[in-house]
UniProtKB/Swiss-Prot annotation:
Single GO biological process annotation from the record: oligosaccharide catabolic process
InterPro entries: Glyco_hydro_13_cat_dom, Glyco_hydro_b, Glycoside_hydrolase_SF, O16G_dom_2, SusG-like_C
Name of the coding gene: ycdG
Name of the protein in its database record: Probable oligo-1,6-glucosidase 2
Keyword list, A-Z: Cytoplasm, Glycosidase, Hydrolase
E.C. no: 3.2.1.10
Organism: Bacillus subtilis (strain 168)
Length: 561
């Protein structure tokens, strides 16, 4: 029988390449993950989401797949995977796999046949179009800053790639493609995998006629209208549910980009029979200049963050379900981004956790977030591996003439590699990640910020996360209650109330490095309040309280007294 077990779960995301190496080759692997399962269990997580482990040329580090039914050699064997799955289940945990269905690697056997023969059945598995007198079919740019059309000399046509040149988009209009994808999904679910996170789901339905990029930048057309939420996206999703998910008691989550809450409800509404929940990125785009790329920085306005998160809480309150996250493999470290990774690293990391993880939804904790890992201080482009970062640097510096120092400032703030530096386990060689040479440099602050140090510090970010997760489970019914934002216009405080018929939870958070004054809400019974969680030592409970830099307090109010 299908259940909503995922509503009470806490998910821990692993980027396997950077989590734990077991054989000294500098690359994390499945046996390394097995060796750290007890750590994840002790944290309090219930589900492990593992990024792609399929064979890949690693142009985009696993998101360019050549075989969806195998394990990449550097990660281990299928036997290793079976042992991982068994060990996960023995600990009462669940395993969710990342599944890439918008595109394949150009090294995939389907594409290798398609590029050589226009008459191959695999030709229609991808988007092929003739060029124009000016070159490509359109002048659009991909997510990685290069043209979306790549010329292929064997047949004299262009193929579509919404991401890197080596990631060719699959043609979901072709029912054979869809059935082949469903077969691959069932392959893993039949092994006992507990769910799938679907990568770039919003891109699978595309429009045939693509307007000019020049029209877009001149504000004459919608931004990239052929990319997200095409007209058949929900038809495809209903088919995925009918063909695959409806036959298993598993979790389904899709990455859908920059959708609105109204659009999000179409994906995850309980009456839609599509997905359990979605990853949207509205709240993660608030520190970029409107209409520009995420490299184009601007300060975060707290009022904007409160507004966006509240809209999602309210819109999905009775229909659908939210994902609660700050970090993943594509985002920089949140304590460096929205907090203070210097003097107030611990305080701000804890405050950020209290802000997001007491909301309604399923928490997603990304590896290293729970110990307050920070962005890396790499100032040379040679130290980066991420194709998105490298492409942007070369385009802006060498093609557009940007100041290299300005470009590097953007990279230091936003590169995906900040999330991908090796997990910091201890203060020993390579942070305990590997005995060999790590595939990506370790953040040099590992001597101070690491799991071993955090485990021995009662006041650590790690121990705070453990308490927070425990409280979510202790008050599981309250975590399904209503959400109401308080003080929406306060420039420093992020305050909200969770409530059910018996209890209230008041989360008060100073989102700044300056002191902030909090007035106890008149409609909240202070006499019935007790402090559940805080990131400073305090025991005062007054009508007016001064909150220190990045201070967070979470109160429980009993409505029955």
């Amino acid at each position: 029988m299908k259940t909503d077990w995922w509503k009470d779960a806490v998910v821990y995301q692993i980027y396997p390449r950077s989590f734990q190496d077991s054989n000294g080759d500098g690359i994390g692997d499945l046996r390394g993950i097995i060796s750290r399962l007890d750590y994840i269990k002790e944290l309090g997580a219930d589900v492990i989401w593992i990024c792609p482990i399929y064979p890949s040329p690693n142009v985009d580090y696993g998101y360019d797949v050549t075989n969806h039914k195998a394990i990449m050699d550097s990660y281990g064997t299928m036997d290793d995977f079976h042992e991982l799955l068994d060990q996960v289940h023995q600990r009462g945990l669940k395993l969710v796999m990342d599944f890439v269905l918008n595109h394949t690697s150009v090294e995939h056997p389907w594409f290798k046949e398609a590029e050589l023969d226009k008459n191959s059945k695999y030709r229609s598995y991808y988007y092929w179009r003739p060029g124009t007198k000016n070159g490509p079919p359109t002048d659009w740019l991909s997510n990685y800053g290069c043209p979306v059309w790549q010329y292929e000399e064997h047949t004299g046509e262009y193929y579509l790639h919404m991401n890197a040149v080596k990631q060719a988009d699959l043609n979901w209009e072709n029912p054979e493609v869809r059935q082949a994808v469903y077969d691959m999904m069932k392959f893993w679910l039949d092994k006992g995998v507990d769910g799938l996170r679907i990568d770039q789901l919003h891109l699978i339905s595309k429009k045939e006629y693509l307007p000019s990029y020049e029209d877009y930048i001149n504000q004459q057309a919608e931004p990239k209208p052929f990319q997200p939420n095409g007209e058949r996206i929900h038809d495809y999703l209903k088919e995925i549910t009918d063909e695959v998910f409806s036959h298993y008691d598993v979790m389904s989550v899709g990455e859908v980009g920059s959708v609105t809450p109204e659009e999000g409800l179409k994906y995850t509404g309980t009456d839609k029979h599509e997905l359990n929940m979605i990853f949207h990125f509205q709240h993660m785009e608030l520190d970029q200049q409107p209409g520009k790329e995420h490299w184009d920085l601007k300060p975060l306005e707290l009022s904007d963050l409160k507004s966006v998160l509240t809209k999602w809480q309210k819109k999905l309150e009775h229909q659908g379900w939210n994902t609660l996250f700050w970090c993943n493999h594509d985002q920089p470290r949140i304590v460096s981004r929205f907090g203070d990774d210097g003097e107030y690293r611990k305080a701000s990391a804890k405050m950020l956790a209290a802000v997001i993880y007491f909301m309604k939804g399923t928490p997603y904790i990304y590896q290293g977030e729970e110990i307050g890992m920070t962005n890396a201080p790499f100032t040379r482009i040679e130290d980066y591996k991420d194709i998105q970062t490298i492409n942007m640097y070369h385009k802006r510096v060498f093609e557009k003439g940007y100041d290299p120092n300005d470009v590097m400032r953007s990279i230091l703030a936003k590169s995906r590699d900040h999330a991908r530096t090796p997990m910091q386990w201890n203060s020993g060689k390579n942070a305990g990640f590997t005995d060999g040479t790590p595939w990506l440099k370790v953040n040099p602050n590992f001597t101070a910020i690491n799991v071993e140090e955090a485990q021995g510090d009662p006041d650590s970010v790690l121990n705070y996360y453990k308490k927070l997760i425990s409280l979510r489970k202790q008050y599981a019914d309250l975590m399904k209650g209503s959400f109401d934002l308080l003080l929406p216009d306060d420039p420093q405080l992020f305050v909200y109330m969770r409530e059910n018929s018996k209890q209230q939870l008041l989360s008060v958070n100073n989102f700044s490095k300056e002191q902030a004054v909090f007035q106890w809400p008149k409609n909240c019974g202070k006499a019935q309040a007790s402090l559940l969680l805080s990131n400073y030592n305090n025991d005062d409970l007054d009508d007016e309280m001064v909150f220190r830099p990045y201070e967070s307090r979470v109160y429980l109010l009993d409505k029955t007294n």
